[in-house]
Amino acid sequence: MARILGVDIPNDKRVVISLTYIFGIGKSTSQQILKLANIDENIRVKDLADEQIAEIRRVALNFVKANGEKLQLEGDLRRTVAMDIKRLMEIGSYRGIRHRRGLPVRGQRTKTNARTRKGPRKTVANKKIETR
């Protein structure tokens, strides 16, 4: 596995997809990095030469430095997202309340579905109806 920006990227995937394993880098950013490095995005990581991997590292680092004020990666981005959610909960906004209650935030229905957010069903035991 190649290590770029402190993250091990998978060998068996195409380079453009492997770079998206870095939290904060999506497909378009990955394509921009590879274009600057003059590397075909369809090559698999395992087929890259050491010089090409070094070039990707260098270009990615320069790309992050050049866009530092608006591009956050890995730990910084995770921390920012967590702080944003915490701030929403503290100010008591609708979105913050939904986060606090563990319900869907973006307006999805909750009468049915929403199981991912709400967790497994909590069944209510119903009383047996006595027959006379």
From Swiss-Prot:
The keyword GTP-binding does not apply. GO terms for molecular function: rRNA binding; structural constituent of ribosome; tRNA binding. The keyword Ribonucleoprotein applies. GO terms for biological process: translation. PROSITE patterns: RIBOSOMAL_S13_1, RIBOSOMAL_S13_2. Keywords: Ribonucleoprotein, Ribosomal protein, RNA-binding, rRNA-binding, tRNA-binding. Residues 101-125 have a biased composition (Basic residues). It holds the Pfam family Ribosomal_S13. InterPro entries: Rbsml_uS13_C (IPR027437), Ribosomal_uS13 (IPR001892), Ribosomal_uS13-like_H2TH (IPR010979), Ribosomal_uS13_bac-type (IPR019980), Ribosomal_uS13_CS (IPR018269). GO terms for cellular component: cytosol; small ribosomal subunit. Residues 101-132 are annotated as: Disordered. Belongs to the universal ribosomal protein uS13 family. Part of the 30S ribosomal subunit. Forms a loose heterodimer with protein S19. Forms two bridges to the 50S subunit in the 70S ribosome. Located at the top of the head of the 30S subunit, it contacts several helices of the 16S rRNA. In the 70S ribosome it contacts the 23S rRNA (bridge B1a) and protein L5 of the 50S subunit (bridge B1b), connecting the 2 subunits; these bridges are implicated in subunit movement. Contacts the tRNAs in the A and P-sites. PANTHER family: 30S RIBOSOMAL PROTEIN S13/40S RIBOSOMAL PROTEIN S18, SMALL RIBOSOMAL SUBUNIT PROTEIN US13M. HAMAP family: Ribosomal_uS13. This is Small ribosomal subunit protein uS13. It comes from Ureaplasma parvum serovar 3 (strain ATCC 700970).
